[in-house]
Amino acid sequence: MLSLFLKRLRWLLLGGTITNIAQATVYPLPPPDTDVIGEIKVIYARKEETLLDIARDHDLGYDEIVHANLGIDRWAPGEGTPIVLPTRFILPDTPREGIVLNIAEMRLYYYPPPSASGERVVHTYPVSIGRMDWKTPMGLTKVVGKEV
């Protein structure tokens, strides 16, 4: 009985961790003649916090936060150090529907269908490459199935 409880607890905790990892930043979709979403922010580092910790907390990629904070030690920025959060993005010049992967920016954009009220949003996630020097396949694709 205890073993079953521990297994369920493990999956519950693991599920919560995965949910946190996959959270995106959501922005209202601007009109078609506007390509910029978000805004640059500045926060102050807490004690023992790394740039990687800050990037994870704010849905940013490692390269994004390091390039926005040149001259700051990525592993020990120091308590109270101002950290620039590059949370302003230029939407890719593609149709604003479905999933768009901007490889150069290392960012994924998801344009879901409009809500029942007609509101449109865009979700954005940092992404990473699988392995250095491997080519990423280019083209239009379609998700035909999903397993959970």
Set out the residue ranges of the language-model regions.
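LysM (lysin motif) carbohydrate-binding repeats in extracellular/periplasmic proteins that recognize
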Residues: 46-76, 118-120
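N-terminal secretory signal peptides that target proteins for export/translocation
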Residues: 1-6
